[in-house]
Amino acid sequence: GPGGSGRGGTWVTRAVRAPWAVVAGWGGAVSGVGVGVAAVADIRLTQGVAKLGLPETGLGIPPSQIAPFLVRRLGLSQACRLAVTGGRFDGHRAVAIGLAHEVAEDEDALEALLATTLKQVLRCAPGAVAVTKQLMNDAGLIEHEALLDGAADAFAVAARGAEGIEGMTAFMQKREPNWPGGEA
């Protein structure tokens, strides 16, 4: 947009559409587009002492580039309250309103939580993660019956694909899967 205002929204949109899991962890100050990035991450972890805010309206501008993402993540009521008040809040409140999934009490705990989460993510099949993200992002945007039909088709394709075969074989053999084209 004019003056480069679309750059933050473009980056946030890319994060939403990424075919891999987007994990965000923060412990310091996060404001404006940073809150938008936090809102679109698939997994969101924070320190309790983190300071988050939406200062845009206090600066005379709307949080235009991140507003749709905040509404989708937090719901209209909560997103509107934060935006029209220039809301400032900590990591505990971020969890309470649904912006973050878990809170860590210090930097070491956040690093440990991130490491555990990344290990969990890396155990999952990359292709299955990509399809899952697409299905979940389509939820609410596509008619329910069409979404279910698409989900059934995606499942059938995945089950017959290399990842589906390896995943089920590993399960039956009681071992960790060795994902084609990736490292577990």
Please name every model-derived segment.
Residues 86-92, 108-112, 116-184:
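C-terminal alpha-helix plus adjacent terminal tail
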Residues 5-8, 56, 75-77, 162-165:
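Short C-terminal domain-edge/linker segments immediately following a structured domain
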Residues 14-127, 175:
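Crotonase-fold acyl-CoA enzyme core
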Residues 3-6, 10, 38, 166-169, ...:
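Compositionally biased, intrinsically disordered low-complexity regions
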Residues 1-14, 30, 142-143:
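Glycine- (often His-adjacent) and acidic-residue-rich active-site loop
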Residues 1-4, 31-32, 61, 136-137, ...:
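A short linear-motif detector with a strong N-terminal bias
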Residues 7, 11, 65-66, 78, ...:
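Hydrophobic alpha-helical segments typical of transmembrane helices
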